[in-house]
């Protein structure tokens, strides 16, 4: 590679795709050299001079490293939209998060953020329901939603699974979902589970007067089977489908979104496996990028972390993810490696806080996230001393206390389910 793509005087065009990277050059490699190689490898260049790359082509398509901060190990690169297949997340990632992550010239390289131009945003559907659509679907306009995951993760029969879901709904949950590793195992077949659970969700609706949503996991070995499962849910009268976004893959997600409008289903995104490339702060891809791609493709709600639960994620990171889900215009934040993003009218996603939560954490969750969040509890409901139904009731009671500005201890004086939760989970 002979070209120099450092261009400090370049002002990105409205049609450029902008990426921010964290770069740590290998021993003996200077920062500018590493940035140049990274920019070239992610676009038009190779490891050596290539005769087939004409000066005219290079001038038109070359990347521009327009910002470098060696002390912060940060660079920003502007790429012409001509380099990308419009409407294709896999192709974008093959460029800006592909071979470059394996280059010897860097010890570590991380894609921190991508800012998409409006010309590229227009090629994507975005969420079909989005935050406001989910509120309309559930009939809940003025509070966080309460959800649960059927526990144990796997092992229950379809009948027992549906029973656990029913008790969760009856106790006050708005949403009940499968866990990420429950799909179509012998002990709990997809179609039977979906049919039984949706019937009991309907029963709970008639008993409580509230809408009850079952989020059945349609993750499958093939896109064809995934779509078949989605259509089964449609025929059964479901309102939702759930997908494991990273194991399923970006092509599967785009395929699912293309078919979701006809099915009329909201799409719940479980982010399991994301840490394989997001957790290392020096290498891979940030969770911020994953969240943006989910909104771009058109998932309706996404797990983003909790701050207070069992999953990794600092408060500033989780709040950056929240903002990327819900804001129409995301401001730049250099301290958090967030690029400005105008979402061009694509609907917001509903953020989901899930992982190691108990009812006693609801006041903190409400303080952190406000009203626009789905609070999702697993063991925090099913490990309640009085059972699943009481665990769900305790969550609703804790939420009611938070909405009214009353302490949990005060509210628990007249709510025995919450009192039992406090006795079990609240640290003395």
UniProtKB/Swiss-Prot annotation:
InterPro entries: RuBisCO, RuBisCO_III, RuBisCO_lsu_C, RuBisCO_lsu_C_sf, RuBisCO_lsu_fd_N, RuBisCO_lsu_N_sf. Substrate binds at residues 153, 271, 303, 354-356, 376-379. One of its GO terms (molecular function) is ribulose-bisphosphate carboxylase activity. The keyword Aminoacyl-tRNA synthetase does not apply. The keyword Oxidoreductase applies. The record marks 310 as: Transition state stabilizer. Mg(2+) binds at residues 177, 179-180. Its cofactor is Mg(2+). It comes from the Archaea. Binds 1 Mg(2+) ion per subunit. Homodimer or homodecamer. In contrast to form I RuBisCO, the form III RuBisCO is composed solely of large subunits. This is Ribulose bisphosphate carboxylase. It comes from Methanosarcina barkeri (strain Fusaro / DSM 804).
